[in-house]
Swiss-Prot record:
HAMAP family: Phosphopentomut (MF_00740)
Originating species: Streptococcus pneumoniae (strain Hungary19A-6)
InterPro entries registered for this protein in UniProt: Alkaline_phosphatase_core_sf (IPR017850), DeoB (IPR010045), Metalloenzyme (IPR006124), Phosphopentomutase_DeoB_cap_sf (IPR024052)
Pathway(s): Carbohydrate degradation; 2-deoxy-D-ribose 1-phosphate degradation; D-glyceraldehyde 3-phosphate and acetaldehyde from 2-deoxy-alpha-D-ribose 1-phosphate: step 1/2
Name of the protein in its database record: Phosphopentomutase
Predominant subcellular localization, coarse grouping: cytoplasm
Length: 403
């Protein structure tokens, strides 16, 4: 019999809690990640007021230097620790796949200086359309169409851009490049990015409509992902007939593998929390696992190195945390974590190699405290242990520590 009937895992995308032991093997604009500390530097430079996460034990997580404005609780309501990454990457897919039990020894490729000419030329030859070279770099999806949409409307050229993650995105005005054509080009791009030196996690079709100065991305987005290279705990749950619910970009990250209820993309963190609350309230969701990603911390503030915005985003989540707790049933378990760091005070604009926090709360808890420092995959091992299924490749359960 399961200790918890339902487990809700919420990933605060990029909310790291200090440089990992191997952080100096990873760099940002030539600067090793060894001094990165997303939560620590936000707390130190702009202040951080997150009383609801603090109540569970955020300030109790072991650190060389305590969080400046998040005090340790003498009697927290839950359990806390930090987790180290094993895999050789610091991107979203690597982090999430490891959380679900995989060890990624061959990381995906990211293109901070844009895609190589060879790829762009192949896409041009296949599509019969030129590619706008100036857009070929990490770009905000809304900014790139504002900047190059008018030109695309005049010339029919393709807008191809990337991000901090291993993705190739193609933006196309629906009146200029029909959806069928856009999808066909994306399928070709997928076929040429399945191995090094351009092993990409996703190809994303990004259609939009409107006039210059008033462009809007449509719901006709299409993701062409790769499935995890081995079964994750999501697959193990699915095979055992245990419901899995995905909120936000989780379904895309796993290419649907092991997920039988996709609750859709988030328009914002707030919308994602609304969707999570709706999911938790489903009468038919009596037993199972929900997996939510809230990406605004990373996409809107981490990469843009906006510490004030990042702090405010954390405040907004913390203010809504009581709603999530109120929606829990007696035998529910809530796990709050991250997938990598993205220190908004650091060099460059890339993710940072960090520990991730882990907060655990349940109305059924009788105890509290600090769990020994572990690894990302311990989360999925704990989920597997709870529901009586096998773990994936790696991970040690901490279920017996939650009392």
């Amino acid at each position: 019999m399961s200790k918890f009937n339902r487990i809700h895992l919420v990933v605060l995308d990029s909310v790291g809690i200090g440089a990992a032991p191997d952080a100096n093997n990873f760099v940002n604009a030539g600067v090793p990640d060894g001094a990165s500390d997303t939560l620590g530097h936000i707390s130190k430079t702009v202040g951080l007021n997150v009383p609801n996460m603090a109540k569970i034990g955020l300030g109790n997580i072991p650190r060389e230097t305590p969080l400046k404005t998040v005090a340790a609780e003498s009697n927290p309501t839950g359990y806390a620790t930090k987790l180290e990454e094993v895999s050789l990457g610091k991107d979203t897919m690597t982090g999430h796949w490891e959380i679900m039990g995989l060890n990624i020894t061959e990381p995906f490729d990211t293109f901070w200086n844009g895609f190589p000419e060879e790829i762009l030329t192949k896409i041009e030859e296949f599509s019969g359309r030129k590619v706008i070279r100036e857009a070929n770099k990490p770009y905000s999806g809304t900014a790139v169409i504002d900047d190059f949409g008018p030109r695309q409307m005049e010339t029919g050229e393709l807008i191809i851009y990337t991000s901090a993650d291993p993705v190739l995105q193609i933006a196309a005005h629906e009146d200029i490049i029909p959806l069928d054509e856009l999808y066909r080009i994306c399928e070709y791009a997928r076929s040429i990015t399945l191995e090094r030196p351009a092993l990409l996690g996703r190809i994303i079709a990004r259609p939009y409509v409107g006039e210059p100065g008033n462009f809007t991305r449509t719901a006709n987005r299409r993701d062409l992902a790769v499935s995890p290279f081995a079964p994750t705990v999501l697959d193990k749950l699915n095979e055992a007939g245990i419901d899995t619910y995905a909120v936000g970009k989780i379904n895309d990250i796993f290419n649907g593998a092991g997920i039988n209820h996709d609750m859709g993309h988030n328009k914002s963190n707030s919308h994602g929390i609304d969707t999570l609350l709706k999911t938790m309230g489903l009468a038919e969701f009596e037993k199972g696992f929900s997996f939510t990603n809230l990406v605004d911390f990373d996409a809107l503030y981490g990469h843009r190195r906006n510490a004030h915005g990042y702090r405010d985003c954390l405040h907004e989540f913390d203010e809504r945390l009581p709603e999530i707790i109120a929606a829990m049933r007696e035998n529910d378990l809530l796990l709050i974590t991250a997938d990598h760091g993205n220190d908004p005070t650091y060099a460059g604009t890339d993710h940072t190699r960090e520990y991730i926090p882990l907060l655990a709360y349940s109305p059924a808890f009788k105890g509290n405290g600090v769990i020994p420092v572990g690894h990302f995959a311990d989360i999925s091992a704990t989920v597997a242990d709870n529901f009586g299924v096998e773990t994936a490749m790696i991970g040690e359960s901490f279920l017996d520590k939650l009392v």
